[in-house]
Amino acid sequence: RCPWDPWCN
């Protein structure tokens, strides 16, 4: 779920 997920960025 990147890069639109903050915890993945």
Curated annotation (Swiss-Prot):
Which pairs of positions does the record mark as disulfide bonds?
A: C2-C8
Q: Where in the cell is it found?
A: Secreted
The tissues where this chain's protein is expressed are given as: Expressed by the venom duct.
Q: What are the protein's UniProt keywords? A: Amidation, Disulfide bond, Ion channel impairing toxin, Neurotoxin, Secreted, Toxin
Q: What GO molecular function terms would the record report?
A: ion channel regulator activity; toxin activity
Q: Which residues carry this modification: Asparagine amide?
A: N9
Primary localization: secreted
* Any one of the GO CC terms: extracellular region
KW Disulfide bond (keyword) present: yes
Q: Does the keyword Ribosomal protein apply?
A: no
**Comment on protein domains:** The cysteine framework is C-C.
Q: What is known about what this protein does?
A: Its target is unknown, but this toxin may modulate voltage-activated calcium channels (Cav) or calcium-dependent potassium channels (KCa).
Question: What family is this protein classified in?
Answer: Belongs to the O2 superfamily. Contryphan family.
Protein's name in the database:
Contryphan-In1172
